Amino acid sequence: LTLFIVLFCHPCYCQSRSVNARKPQDQIPIDSCLYSITYTYHYANDTTGKVRLFDKQVLEIGTTTVHYYSKNAALIDSIMFQAKVAVNPRKSFAANERELYEDIYWNYPHKDSIGVYTGLVNVDYFYEEPVPSMEWKLTEDTCSILGYTCFRASTRFRGRSYTAWFTPGIPISHGPWKFNGLPGLILKARDEADLFVWEAQNISREQNKKVYVMNPRFNKIIETTRTKLLRLQEKRWKDPAGLYVQHGSAMHVRDNKTGKFMKMAPGQLVLPYIPVPELE
């Protein structure tokens, strides 16, 4: 049986930017940031369980808005658009460290809603939905995270069961990703299969820091819905070559036996299931 290595079409460092990189200068301030919480997000690359990756992510609490995004993606954007010579923006990354281009905004662009920007291939998709309702079951179980006493809570949300640890010591009803609705800041969360784990690493009180959003005047953004985006994300494993063709790109694989690269046609390749936090 011939083995293949999938080569996704990321442009080379010296001539081009990461496929989802966003120019920092094209962002606009929308709020003042009061708190920044840095999380490490560990996730399974696929359900074979052989590879676990991680991203460094940030939750910014503003006066009226909340922003959750990849710190690694922001770092790559800054390096790529400031570099005057050839540079590898991931040089300081660990072997299993990645950057996930997804930005989640609370109360933006409208109050009582969340706006989500997701990078897929070479396009930013945007959708808006009402603030998700999470029904939590609280317990008396406790643990200590970053010196804060945290309580355990559990919920079922969009097809998956999650456990979260929150601290009433910081009365902010938010957390990583879309988690919300608990009487305190969520410092750790995981799903029942341990496919996804978020854990806080640092909490900072901010001064003179802004919350930014991409300026649609300077960025290619396609408006969609959450369910339509989920269907597109499914193609990452059901038909990845078709997904790239759909976005005006291409996918090649290398034959481990011959070393030759081959262009894949839509429907020609299926990958192990790539989990997503939302199933429905």
Question: Which functions belong to the PLM regions below?
Answer:
Residues 16-280:
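Extended soluble regions of mature proteins
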Residues 2-11:
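Bacterial N-terminal signal peptides
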